[in-house]
């Protein structure tokens, strides 16, 4: 029989439950340059003071638990705890508050978005004292962002690889997204690329299904790329979706794409996971592949205004995890995206330094130092009449992706691609000549359609198409 032992708590330990705000609400705290800062939209349960709710978020996403524990005495709580250092009411919302929380850098593993999110957006989102909780923004200090590789290549390197400058890049998602055989799929890719597009794309749920196994698709798409390049003299690409059920299978697909000599692969980074995405991004940099990122599943996380996580946080996480393109809404198409908010996180993807600007939803100044930028992709329900607005809103460093707006052309895929390329070139030229695309955009398209029958046909077929719904993602 083992001897009876007794563990004595340290002097000063007092068991029981105490208010979080006694330890984790510290309005006098001065944030450090190395702190990771978070802005949470907090909706407390009735009767819970906002200070207690904010402190609870800080505690449960860092060192705290529901009761006092004697092992607190074995470490420095002041060094490692998260701190709710400010709370402000949300204008127009009676029971919502923005709680600002500072986390010391040592709480997080270097170079791991997975670990960062496990703490900051982990169990705390199921906390009973809160009716709802949304992470609006994060400030990632250079001391932490420099532990990440970031995008495999970035905007300038991609332009140099493709030898394409001075305009947005043009893409197209192949439709129908499911059901085509690999050979017919490759044929659609070829028609779009020879018509003038820079890229074509696997849809997010094209992986390796019975009707089209991944290896067959990769081979036929590579054939289409090389044939279109030979005919046009331009470098072309197709986003070959390497997303798979295991990381090993994903890497096998990326390796095969590299062996085929194609320029770019694709990953669904939310459904695939940040660990898989970061692994793929490292492989892409080491092997000269560009990496296109699809955000499938993002609206499950970011669409509700009072619970979840804003896409600007997912965008920052992707820039650290690694990707050269990411879908970012259109402002004018069928998918969610309000202009000022969308441009806020577009700047967070592309620029080196972004000032705090609450009018665009940016809660913190963000300094990426030398981390490469990510090209935002505008995709979803857009067509030639949207081209002036897209050119004006997103600028040159973007990818404009027309799926139905290419493949739905009455004359076929190649004429659809021609129409989009002519419209884009006309808008870029008009902008460079000093014309106001916001006011004169439709006239620019009409003028170009006079000498392009492909564009004229596209203008006619989509002249009445509009997606006029109020955006959910507003400030």
From Swiss-Prot:
CC cofactor note: Binds 1 Mg(2+) ion per subunit.
N6,N6,N6-trimethyllysine, modified sites: 14
Propeptide stretch(es), residue numbers: 1-2
EC number: 4.1.1.39
General function of this protein: RuBisCO catalyzes two reactions: the carboxylation of D-ribulose 1,5-bisphosphate, the primary event in carbon dioxide fixation, as well as the oxidative fragmentation of the pentose substrate in the photorespiration process. Both reactions occur simultaneously and in competition at the same active site.
Family under the similarity heading: Belongs to the RuBisCO large chain family. Type I subfamily.
PANTHER family: RIBULOSE BISPHOSPHATE CARBOXYLASE (PTHR42704), RIBULOSE BISPHOSPHATE CARBOXYLASE LARGE CHAIN (PTHR42704:SF15)
The protein's name: Ribulose bisphosphate carboxylase large chain
Organism in which the protein naturally occurs: Picea sitchensis
